Design a protein with these regions (language model features):
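Histidine-acidic metal/acid-base catalytic patches
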Residues: 1-5, 19-22, 75, 155-168, ...
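N-terminal pre-domain/capping segments
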Residues: 1-68, 72-91, 262-264
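Hydrophobic faces of well-ordered beta-strands that scaffold small-molecule active sites
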Residues: 4-10, 29-33, 64-68, 104-106, ...
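A short acidic, helix-capping loop that chelates divalent metal ions and anchors anionic groups
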Residues: 39-41, 72-77, 112-119, 205-210
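Charged helix-capping and loop-helix junction motifs
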Residues: 45-52, 81-90, 122-130, 181-188, ...
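A short helix->loop->beta-strand "cap" motif at the edges of active sites that frequently abuts
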Residues: 60-62, 101, 143-144, 229-234
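Active-site acidic/histidine proton-transfer and metal-coordination neighborhood
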Residues: 75-169, 260
Length: 264
């Protein structure tokens, strides 16, 4: 058996968080509960659904990782927008605290959204990000539960903050592959701090979060081999949002694990 656990997202089926967890339980060990836009009336689970999520967690020995809102701009040059982003994250933290999450995934953009321009002052960017992250930690969270996601820039730019605050990393290998980055070197660099590896394929036209069928087989095998050889005990999340993509990805992962076991 691999040292790592397998995860799925709460958007595999067009249904509620709990309905997804109920169908995925027994097939994966962790569910990444997605709260991309929690501002609306249906943006967060109600008390009954939260209780159901607790019951499912306990019955199936699951863990939950929480993906915080995409709109939270934690290093914005606009102080009001940055404060609003912190408040968005904390709203999700408060709503899901009863689930005892094993990780909280955070986006720290260069500006106010992904693919924005590089900030003119790197140190000021780090200071703004650190201020927001300290506020989130001060809300009663263990620093290592906060996972800064590797986005569209070199995370070494933010590494002093991550290391200084003793945070963790969510390594989106799907995006690294999409962007043509040296995923193996980046994985080796950050794996000791990585609690989650997010994995998905990219179609030829550039659409990501697709089936792992779109990842070259030798690359997919190399990733699983690297995680296994490192005895990494985090969560490998199949970060796809559709049933067929999930089924095909899970089947491919199982095949790779069997191949690696047979060769060992």
């Amino acid at each position: 058996m691999p040292p790592f656990r397998t995860g799925a997202t709460s958007f595999v089926y067009p249904a509620s968080w709990a309905a997804n967890v109920e169908r995925l339980a027994g097939r994966v060990e962790d569910i990444e509960l997605l709260f991309f836009a929690p501002q609306g009336p249906d943006g967060l689970p109600d008390p009954a659904e939260l209780q159901r999520l607790v019951e499912l967690r306990d019955r199936h020995a699951l863990t939950y990782s929480i993906h915080t809102p995409l709109s939270a701009s934690l290093a914005s040059e606009d102080d009001a927008r940055r404060a609003a982003g912190v408040a968005e994250v904390l709203r999700v933290v408060d709503a899901t605290r009863c689930l005892s999450p094993s990780a909280y995934v955070l986006h720290v953009y260069w500006g106010d959204a992904e693919h924005g321009p590089r900030p003119s002052d790197d140190e000021a960017f780090r200071q703004r990000a650190a201020r927001s992250l300290r506020q989130i930690i001060a809300h009663g969270l263990a620093p290592e539960l906060l996972c800064v996601e590797y986005l569209d820039y070199d995370l070494d730019l933010l590494a002093p903050v991550i290391e200084g605050l003793e945070l963790s990393v969510a390594l989106d290998v799907g995006h690294l592959l999409r962007d043509g980055r040296d995923w193996a070197a980046i994985l080796a660099r950050y794996l000791p701090r990585t609690r989650l590896v997010q994995w998905h394929g990219t179609q030829p036209g550039g659409r990501d979060h697709q089936s792992l069928e779109h990842v070259p087989r030798e690359v997919a095998r190399a990733l699983v081999e690297q995680l296994t050889a490192a005895n990494w005990d985090g969560v490998l999340t199949l970060e796809v949002f559709e049933e067929q993509a999930f089924e095909r990805s899970l089947a491919l992962l199982s095949q790779l694990q069997q191949e690696i076991t047979c060769r060992a």
